[in-house]
Structure formats: C-alpha cells, structure tokens
C-alpha cells in the first residue's frame, strides 16, 4: 500500500507537550479548530536523514478543549459557553477557567443560576494551577487542589474524572451535587475529605495505583481497608462493614440512606459526626469501642434504639442530638463517663421517656451518676 505523503503546504512543527513512557507517548496539540479534520504525520530528522511516518487522520469535536495557557477557557468557548452537556478538557486551568467551568455547570460566581447544563466532565489531562480570580466567594485556586466548593450546587453534574496530578480534595468540594452518581479518584490523591449533599452518589472509584486510598463496592476506604472514609449517600438498604474495618472516619456516613448498620466487633474507633443526619433506625455499636465521639448520631431523626458495648468508657457532647431515642442498651457494668451535653438535644427531650437498660444489679450505679441520673427510666435488664 502506498504511503500518503504530506503536501507542500503541510506545516512542520516541533511539538514537545507530550507525556508517557517508553513505547507510548501522549502528545497534546493545542489551538485546533473545532469540528475540523486534520491529517497528522510523525516526522523526524537527524544527521542520517529524515523519515515520515504513516498519516493519522483526526477530526476534532465540540466536546474536547485544549488550553495552551491558564485563563483562556472563556475566550476559547466564546458564544458556545452554554452549549455543552459533556466535555473533555486538557491543559492548565486557573481560577478564571474554573469559574467559567462552573458557569457551564449552571452556577455563577454569586451562586445564581446560569443556562449551563454541563453534566459529564473528563479532566484527566488538566493541570490545576494557582492564579486568576476566585471560583467562588473568597475561594482561590491552589496548585493540584480540588478546593472546597469547586463543584458546589452544580445540579446537572453526573460524572467527573479528576486530573491525574491532583493531590488534595478538600471537604465539601462537591457539596449538594444532587445528580452526581460517580467520582473517580486518581492515583495522585493523598489528602481527601468527603462532601455532603450528594444524594445520588453511589460509586466512588479509586485508581489501583493510588497508595493512600482504595474502594470496595463503591465505598471509599484507606489503602489498608481498615478505615471507612466516605460512604456514598445514594446507597440504600442494609450495610455490613467488611471484617477488616477497625475504624470509621469523621463524617464518613453523614446523610447516608442506610437504615441498618452491622458493625464488626473488632472496630475500636468511630470518627466525629460519623453518622450525622443519616437515616439509621437502630445501631449496635462494636464491643471494642471505647468512646462515642462528638455528634456521632446528631440529626439522626429516625434513630430509636442504640446498643452500647461493655468496653465503652466515654460519650461526648451532642452524640444523640435530635434523635428520638426510645431505648438505650448499655452492657458496661460501670456508667460510661459522659460530657455535660452528651444527651442534650435541640428536639424533644428523651430523658423522660427513653428506657436505659443496664446489666443486672447495676442500676444503682447509673442512677447515682451525675449525667445518667437525668434519665427517669433506668432498669436492670439482661435482654440484649
């Protein structure tokens, strides 16, 4: 077969914006016209002569944008800003670019709506760089960081693939993205905090090359799979934690829809606000858990029954705020030490109605405790 040879008017250009290893390279070519077909020849020249490789035909589309310089996204898109529902981006992006991207997703700088309906974003080859204006109220871009509120309140967003060199995902970077179903975490991420209000989120995937995090059935864990860090709100029903889990991170199950949790007895640590505002109805805490931290079940408006293990020694402030508790089962023979607001609630007080079940013969200890004695119904009860 005859090889196609570039014509006299073909442009010869040395391109160096490439990445990759031995055997495969990725070349980024900018300033191409949208919806245009290009013919590209690899060309090399040395003292021994020159060579031209086989022609590659490539047609640009209107859903892929390559930035040569940070801050130029708005000018590249011009009047087509709100025409995109899916988009692949590459190149450097600063605060101006990310503010423009938020407009495409339906949000102005002042959080008012725009006509934008961008739903699917591939940012694999994007480099987030400091500079430019804010992307939100007093929020400025840092190098390699998905900042707090970057995707906040973007109702149309369903899927996002993050840049491969991102190192940090701040708390609530995706807050209130109510259509977001899937997030892909790249290998480079070493610091990550969850986002609240992602009611449709069912799947958090992590690159197998990431040495800090992992994912099992769409749930974000640490690399050793001993700590749950982020449980997707969109998962429903019953959830049994893997037997390898020994701890739950701060706010890991916040606002989740699971009603029944089965926690392994070898778990020894639960983070602050771990189940805050979730739909849990009944929970049996692990036998080895020593402390129930601040706001563990705060805002769990369906939680009625809590079972506390024999090794629990302390309960922190507002652990059960706004919970309509009817029964607390405590296996500890001595009353766990409680902070002064351990059972304080902004809702209807449960101190007069909730029954505290304690080990046989131990009711007197609880009735004599400065905090536990606030409950009007404490009884020795061997039932579990």
Regions found by a protein language model. Name each.
Residues 1, 42, 58, 87, ...:
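Extracellular/surface recognition and adhesion modules
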Residues 1-62:
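Short, surface-exposed linear motifs at loops/turns and structural transition points
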Residues 62-78:
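Boundary/junction segments of secreted and surface-exposed precursor proteins
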Residues 64-68, 85-93, 111-144, 154-168, ...:
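Structural signature of tandem-repeat unit edges
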Residues 75-80, 103-113, 150-151, 346-348:
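Leucine-rich repeat
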Residues 100-106, 138, 340-347, 364-375:
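Short, aromatic/basic amphipathic alpha-helical patches
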Residues 147-150, 170-173, 249-252, 271-274, ...:
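Consensus positions within tandem repeat domains that build extended binding/scaffold surfaces
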């Amino acid at each position: 077969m005859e090889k196609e040879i570039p014509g006299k008017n073909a442009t010869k250009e040395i391109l160096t914006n490439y990445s990759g290893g031995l055997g495969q390279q990725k070349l980024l070519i900018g300033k191409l016209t949208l919806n245009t077909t290009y013919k590209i020849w690899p060309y090399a020249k040395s003292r021994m002569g020159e060579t031209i490789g086989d022609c590659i035909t490539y047609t640009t589309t209107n859903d892929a944008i390559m930035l040569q310089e940070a801050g130029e996204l708005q000018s590249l898109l011009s009047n087509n800003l709100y025409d995109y529902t899916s988009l692949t981006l590459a190149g450097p992006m600063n605060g101006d670019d990310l503010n423009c991207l938020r407009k495409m997703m339906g949000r102005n700088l002042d959080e008012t709506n725009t006509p934008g309906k961008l739903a699917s974003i591939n940012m694999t080859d994007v480099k987030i760089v400091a500079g430019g204006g804010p992307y939100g109220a007093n929020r400025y871009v840092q190098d390699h960081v998905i900042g707090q509120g970057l995707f906040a309140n973007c109702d149309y967003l369903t899927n996002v693939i993050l840049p491969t060199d991102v190192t940090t995902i701040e708390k609530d970077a995706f807050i209130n993205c109510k259509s977001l179903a899937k997030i892909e975490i790249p290998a480079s991420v070493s610091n990550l905090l969850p986002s609240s209000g992602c009611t449709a989120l069912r799947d958090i995937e992590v690159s197998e090359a990431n040495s800090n995090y992992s994912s099992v059935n769409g749930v974000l864990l640490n690399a050793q799979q001993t700590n749950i860090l982020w449980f997707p709100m969109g998962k429903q029903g019953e959830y049994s934690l893997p037997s390898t889990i020994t701890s739950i991170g701060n706010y890991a199950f916040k606002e989740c829809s699971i009603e029944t949790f089965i926690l392994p007895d070898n778990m020894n640590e639960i983070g602050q606000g771990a189940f805050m505002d979730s739909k849990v109805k009944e929970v049996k805490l692990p036998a080895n858990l020593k402390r129930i931290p601040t706001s563990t079940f705060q805002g769990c408006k369906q939680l009625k029954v809590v079972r506390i293990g024999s090794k629990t020694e302390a309960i922190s402030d507002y652990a059960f705020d706004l919970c309509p508790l009817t029964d607390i089962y405590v296996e500890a023979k001595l009353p766990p030490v409680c902070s002064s607001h351990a059972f304080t609630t902004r809702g209807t007080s449960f101190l007069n109605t909730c029954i505290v079940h304690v080990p046989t013969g131990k009711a007197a200890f609880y009735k004599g405790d400065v905090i536990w004695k606030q409950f009007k119904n404490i009884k020795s009860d061997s039932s579990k």
